[in-house]
Amino acid sequence: MCNEFAQERAWREYCEMMTREALGIFSDEPPELPFGSVRPSERAAIISAAPGGSRLDLLPWGWPPYAGKGLVINLRSEKRKEPPHARGIAPMDRFYEYRGTQPPKSKFAFAPAINEPLGFAVAVRDGKFALLTTEPNSDVAEIHDRMPVTLRLADWRAWLTSETWPADLMAPADAGTLRAVQVR
């Protein structure tokens, strides 16, 4: 499952996106953002709901191990119903998936094929996040059997603020939303 994605925008760009979508912005001084690939245990820019708007923070990817297993980085959306205060968005410029069962596996980058920012639906707990996953759309299905829940910019507000579980947003992204390029 997804264990690497890229964020390649400046703090200011994320704040501008949030303002355009009338999400408001409440954040501390802009920190030095990681640029490029984000892997489990590393910090990423996460947008979450806040009183009167939203926040932009740097949070580490992964929850503590559960039942002796490794870091929890992905959660099946079919088994979750996070309340608004536990939802977030990880803006992304691309994510990576692997195909094959034996090394060396083929590595594919998936980037937006549409001219708008995309973000992953995430669950936030104790200042850490995990990606929510769903069935793959046709853009991803040939490479992997799951994909991150990918939200279009117009859906960010509903994901962050809906008092009821927005099950419709947990569906796979529309076909043609992503383009794949083999990188290895």
Positions of the model-derived regions?
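Short linear sequence motif anchored by a di-proline
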Residues: 1-184
